[in-house]
Design a protein with these regions (language model features):
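Conserved phosphate/ATP/ADP-binding segment of small-molecule kinases
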Residues: 98-216
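Single conserved hydrophobic/aromatic residue that forms the stacking wall/gate
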Residues: 222-232
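Hydrophobic residues at beta-strand termini and immediately following loops
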Residues: 219
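Active-site beta-loop-alpha junctions enriched in small/polar residues
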Residues: 62, 91-93, 120, 206
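Glycine/small-residue-rich loop that forms an oxyanion/phosphate-binding "nest" at active or ligand-binding sites
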Residues: 71, 76-108, 112-114
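Ser/Thr-centric signal marking residues that sit
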Residues: 19, 23, 211, 228
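Conserved N-terminal subdomain of the carbohydrate kinase-like
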Residues: 1-88
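Positions that flank functional sites
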Residues: 46-47, 94, 209
Length: 232
């Protein structure tokens, strides 16, 4: 991690953000603190030109409106064309049909290198992409959990199927909370979405999950007991 942060400070990349006005100041300050340089631009007439000058693109659905959608599409496609890193934060994606439709459209038209959301937001994306498994009861962590360091794109989404984690506005629904008991199922679902979209998926909460589809980091603010392996 130290090496990556030093690299960012050395390169000082310009990052294009089409984000929500609630957190725009925080996003800019975090980028500056990391050694990057932020620019906030959501005018459709200039986003392709702005993106071309940058080294990365951050799209955030927090304060979504009709004006931002074509701007996000154009910026995303330009970033893909130039090989820039593109990140999606699907804030409150389950709160309305408008947000779901926009997210589905973006996932079809833009290839994302990373998607970060709370558990309800990620479950909604999984539902849109047809990778959300129906709950078949508690799954033993010891039977399926593959938690290790990460070692190791096309029409991504199909029809809406599975369970839709709508959340509470922009917050995760309490019923969706990642716990020790359901951890293995959430890891499995996150990996499936990651493989489907060929992107890194990060789920944030009391227990964070970060997966590349093959392996998964589990970062916890609470104690998770060491899984026991069944006897051979």
């Amino acid at each position: 991690m130290k090496e990556y942060l030093e690299n960012v400070r050395c390169v000082a990349p310009l990052i294009h953000n089409i984000t929500n006005y609630v957190t725009a100041n925080d996003v800019a300050n975090v980028l500056l603190a990391c050694g990057a340089s932020p620019i906030m631009a959501d005018e459709e007439a200039e986003v392709e030109e702005i993106t071309a000058h940058c080294m990365g693109l951050n799209l955030n659905l927090g304060t979504l409106n009709q004006k931002k959608i074509p701007a996000m599409q154009k910026a995303g496609k330009m970033a893909n064309k130039l090989g820039h890193v593109v990140v999606l934060d699907p804030v409150g994606v389950g709160a309305s049909s408008f947000r779901k439709q926009t997210a589905e459209q973006l996932l079809k038209e833009v290839r994302f290198d990373a998607i970060r959301g709370n558990i309800s937001e990620i479950k909604t994306l999984a539902s849109l992409c047809g990778t959300q498994e129906k709950n078949s009861g508690n799954m033993a962590v010891s039977d399926t959990m593959d938690v290790e360091k990460i070692t190791d794109k096309s029409d991504h989404c199909g029809k809406i199927t599975g369970i839709d984690g709508s959340g509470r506005g922009v917050d995760a629904d309490n019923a969706d909370t990642v716990t020790e008991e359901n951890l293995a199922q959430h890891i499995s679902n996150a990996k499936m979405l990651s493989k489907k979209l060929q992107t890194i998926v990060a789920i944030t909460g009391a227990i964070d999950l970060v997966t590349d589809g093959s392996s998964c980091y589990v970062l916890s603010l609470i104690h998770i007991s060491e899984p026991t392996r069944p006897e051979p």
